[in-house]
UniProtKB/Swiss-Prot annotation:
This is Holo-[acyl-carrier-protein] synthase. Belongs to the P-Pant transferase superfamily. AcpS family. One of its GO terms (molecular function) is magnesium ion binding. Its EC number is 2.7.8.7. Pfam families: ACPS. The keyword Calcium does not apply. The keyword Membrane does not apply. Mg(2+) binds at D8, E59. It comes from Rickettsia rickettsii (strain Sheila Smith).
Length: 131
């Protein structure tokens, strides 16, 4: 059963400006500890695109849950990782989402400077039969 769909688009140049002003603060506000480890391994040239994609992904996932960031789900509640083939994997830890468990999140990310986009689909793991 479909729970929701969310999308977000981010100007990478906007993130570059924020990083110039607040190089570490912004990353620590948006990224979880697992994501910060990945971020630290990147060259600075890739930081803005990485952060822009994570920002867009977290916004898209929160919208798919029907709430948006700060309305039951925060940036630190959502972790975006990648499998061995590069496919984005989403981990969510929030009291808001506990009532929806179990669920699957499908996420697609794309970037082509100066923008990146994220598209999320959330479905319940239960099959609901309506009569």
């Amino acid at each position: 059963m479909l729970i929701g769909v969310g999308t977000d688009i981010v100007q990478i140049s906007r993130i570059e400006k924020i990083l110039h002003l607040y190089p570490e603060l912004f990353a620590k506000k948006i990224l979880t500890s697992k994501e910060l480890k990945q971020f630290a391994l990147l060259g600075k040239i890739n930081h803005a695109a990485f952060l822009a994609k994570r920002f867009a992904a977290k916004e898209a996932v929160s919208k798919a849950f029907g709430v948006g960031i700060g309305q039951g789900i925060n940036f630190k509640d959502i972790t975006i990782l990648n499998n061995d083939l590069g496919k984005p994997i989403v981990e969510v830890s929030s009291n808001y989402t506990n009532k929806l468990s179990p669920f699957n999140i499908h996420l697609s990310l794309a970037d082509d400077y100066p923008v990146c986009v994220a598209f999320a689909v959330i479905e319940s793991s239960y099959n609901v039969i309506r009569g």
